[in-house]
Amino acid sequence: MTEQHPTVSIIIPHWNGIETLSECIDSLLKSTFESYEVIVADNASSDGSQAWIKESHPHIKLVENDRNYGYAGGCNRGADKASGEFLVFLNNDTIQKSDWLHYLVELMEKDNTIAAAQPKILNYYQKKMFDYAGGSGGYMDMFCFPYARGRLFLEQEEDQGQYNDAKKCFWASGTAIMVRKELFVEAGKFDEIFFAHMEEIDLCWRLQAMGHHVWVEPQSIVYHKNAVSLPMHTHRKYYLNHRNSLLMLLSNFSVPVAFYVGFIRIMLEFIAVGYAVIKLDWNHVTGILRSLIWILFHPVTILK
């Protein structure tokens, strides 16, 4: 780890979970790429995380936020303290192969049209399986439903080398995304309205609208636990996923396209509500309905 003029600034948004963060940092410190710094953006943890970082890892930059700003806000505040040419936003529930940074930096340095890139992301617990949150590069269908190589709906594929080609994609996963700092700032950073979920897709959309590209480099490998900070199947997770998907659609398309696609998407949301009712999944039902109410009452925010 380099203390002065690092090439890469690794920013870890964090909210509680010392054991999880400790494993992530221990893995980072084994990196064979040496020109990097680590910044932990702590979102007002209540478990003593700040004191633990100061005592156990005094060379790590600690950003002590006054409240929980979510992934988007935590990352933005961490980026403000970064010195590197490249920023890596990294989930705290990850471990990494020792050469992961080398491959990402090599990709970015050989092609300056690439604004952002992600590694191959595999499941922490089943290391031959792709992870749900990003797999080997993310894409978007015509109705703005995100999907990824290595994931079909809710099912993850086994990694058999079928997606080992470095290639252009639509979005890079916020689990581990490298972005050129200059372009991150120029694009307006993460939109903090998102709080958590899909803010990285929104960022990648804006970077591409600026004329840049997003890639996946599968030689770089990260393992992800998934849903540690915000568990699956909770009301809040459903709400943020549905709201942010609609917010992203309405914010990035032109008005005529947003109106057309948005109308179809809202119809699909109501179908999803009906399906959730049949399954008696009330967290899902209330999460979708709350997201639609938010969209209805925030037109100025969406069209800003």
Model-derived features: positions:
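Short, acidic, metal-binding catalytic loop of nucleotide-sugar glycosyltransferases
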Residues: 26-35
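Short beta-strand/loop segment that forms part of the nucleotide-sugar
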Residues: 35-44, 61-65
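Glycine-rich, basic loop-to-helix element that forms the pyrophosphate-binding segment
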Residues: 65-82, 92, 103
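Short aromatic/hydrophobic "clamp" motif used to bind/position activated sugar donors
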Residues: 87
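Conserved donor NDP-sugar-binding/catalytic core segment of glycosyltransferases
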Residues: 94-145
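A recurrent flexible, glycine/aromatic-enriched loop bordering the glycosyltransferase active site
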Residues: 138, 142-148, 153-182, 201-203, ...
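A short, conserved alpha-helix in the catalytic core of glycosyltransferases
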Residues: 164-221
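Active-site-adjacent helix/loop segment of glycosyltransferases
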Residues: 210-303
